[in-house]
Amino acid sequence: MRCPFCGAPDTRVIDSRLAGEGDQVRRRRECLSCSERFTTYENAELNMPRVVKRDGSREPFNEDKLKSGMTHALEKRAVSTDKVEEAVARIKRKLLGQGEREVDSRRIGEWVMEELRNLDQVAYIRFASVYLSFADVQAFREVIERLEKDLTPEMRKHQIPLLGDEEGEGKD
């Protein structure tokens, strides 16, 4: 691999390890000319299915678009970039696991909502408000109430209530 510092054509690998939940290889390299070190990541090149949009149009799967949508919902929330990367990797594995050449965008949206629900309630609500196109405040409240009701004890430990506590505090 060419050195990004001096442009020399020869580098050597000094360390390799798995990264990204095992679907990436992280390599530390050293240039044989200038001795600078740098990191590279190796991913398998996979043929992702095409996405069928609501209007029937088709487009190639875009990981950056998926990550951007999730990151936007998680803006100013205490969720690490690593957690987002792991969620994106799980969604990609689901896409590949379908074994289909095309996948409906609604299915991807459902997987994103599932991942956000597990990461952060506020991000889930932010995404759902756009994805589900709430008609009114009542529809918004119903999704929040369903979300709070469906939380597992483990998830409840890591989240703050959206509508007050179990005793009805904060509810009118």
Curated annotation (Swiss-Prot):
PROSITE patterns per the UniProt record, alphabetical: ATP_CONE
Cofactor(s) essential for the protein: Zn(2+)
PANTHER family linked: TRANSCRIPTIONAL REPRESSOR NRDR
Keyword Zinc: yes
Name recorded for this polypeptide: Transcriptional repressor NrdR
Zinc finger (unnamed): 3-34
Gene Ontology BP term (one): negative regulation of DNA-templated transcription
Function summary: Negatively regulates transcription of bacterial ribonucleotide reductase nrd genes and operons by binding to NrdR-boxes.
Cofactor binding, note field: Binds 1 zinc ion.
Coiled coil spans: none
Record family assignment: Belongs to the NrdR family.
